């Protein structure tokens, strides 16, 4: 008896085929290699006007033109492209925030006005975002980590400016403030911006490393491309015998079970290849 209401037993033929273990937005999935014709880097493809959000486009395969499906969209996840766009917009906004911050620090120092923006690196928009941001993209996290110290020093510049106001000699005070502003403008801010841009480059690289799994139906006549984030391993999938409460996942017609494998740690959700393929092959034709 299956432990999961949605779990379907593997066929005898599937048992003798390893599974493709892949990643999709920080979660692990598998699909039996019996249903996989080929594994490709994302090829050049044509977008389809007014296509559903789960159809990325079509590309030439040896059997003709086949559709590329966005498995993220099919499972109710944010698409890779949307995730990249959001990240690009966030980086651009936080970059401009800190350019504006330095501009305002220079202006208020020169005018003698009170600086009203935050001196706390954890309370600016970038700091608030970074403190709660997590990613399994090591490149992104590496460059964001490198941003911490120059970001701290940048915000500490306002405290240094305030202390410099205690210098009695006007010329000495002006020299000190010019030095502080120069460090903020030419050292700390560029390092923050460079780290953000390199984090974005790493994110872009990971998107470019997406993989297409070319699936085939039982007859071998119909094919579709399934876009996934990254292929991790090809090995045996071991269906779980322990009850798990994945209520939202149970509602997906594209998930057939849950299990593990030896080389990749963590729970792995098994994709029902037949359901994915039939969603395209047997999809109702749109009315004119």
Per-region residue spans from a language model:
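Flexible, small-/acidic-enriched active-site or ligand-binding loops
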Residues: 35-59, 228-264
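Short, structured motif recognition centered on aromatic/hydrophobic residues
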Residues: 29-31, 65-71, 225-226, 265-272, ...
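N-terminal assembly/transducer modules of large multi-domain enzymes
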Residues: 55-65, 156-157, 224, 262-270
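Extended intrinsically disordered, low-complexity coil regions enriched in Ser, Thr, Gly, Ala
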Residues: 77-82, 118-119, 208, 224-250, ...
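Short flexible coil/turn linkers enriched for glycine and charged/polar residues
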Residues: 14, 25, 52, 206-207, ...
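DNA polymerase processivity clamps
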Residues: 55, 71-86, 201-220
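N-terminal membrane-sensor/transducer module of prokaryotic signaling receptors
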Residues: 78-207, 285
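The feature marks the first
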Residues: 2-53
């Amino acid at each position: 008896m299956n432990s999961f209401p949605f779990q379907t037993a593997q066929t005898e033929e599937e048992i003798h085929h390893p599974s493709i273990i892949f990643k999709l937005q920080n979660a692990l999935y598998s699909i039996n290699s019996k249903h996989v014709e080929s594994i490709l880097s994302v090829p050049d493809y044509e977008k389809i006007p007014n296509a559903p959000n789960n159809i990325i486009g079509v590309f030439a395969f040896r059997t003709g033109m086949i559709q590329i499906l966005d498995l993220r969209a099919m499972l109710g996840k944010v698409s890779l492209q949307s995730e990249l766009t959001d990240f690009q917009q966030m980086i651009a906004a936080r970059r401009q925030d800190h350019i504006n911050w330095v501009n305002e620090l220079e202006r208020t120092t020169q005018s003698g006005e009170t600086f009203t923006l935050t001196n706390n690196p954890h309370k600016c928009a970038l700091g608030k975002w970074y403190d709660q941001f997590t990613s399994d993209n090591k490149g992104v996290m590496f460059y964001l980590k490198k941003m911490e110290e120059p970001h701290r020093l940048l915000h500490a510049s306002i405290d240094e400016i305030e202390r410099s106001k205690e210098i009695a000699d006007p010329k000495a005070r002006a020299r000190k403030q010019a030095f502080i502003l120069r460090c903020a403008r030419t050292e700390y801010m560029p390092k923050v911006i460079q780290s953000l841009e390199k984090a974005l480059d790493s994110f872009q690289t990971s998107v470019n490393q997406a993989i297409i799994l070319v699936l085939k139906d039982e007859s071998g006549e119909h094919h579709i491309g399934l876009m996934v984030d990254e292929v991790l391993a090809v090995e045996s999938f071991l269906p779980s015998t322990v009850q798990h409460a994945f209520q939202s996942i149970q509602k997906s017609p594209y998930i057939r079970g849950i299990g593990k494998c030896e080389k990749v740690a963590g729970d792995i959700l098994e994709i029902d290849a037949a359901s994915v393929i039939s969603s395209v092959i047997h999809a109702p034709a749109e009315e004119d």
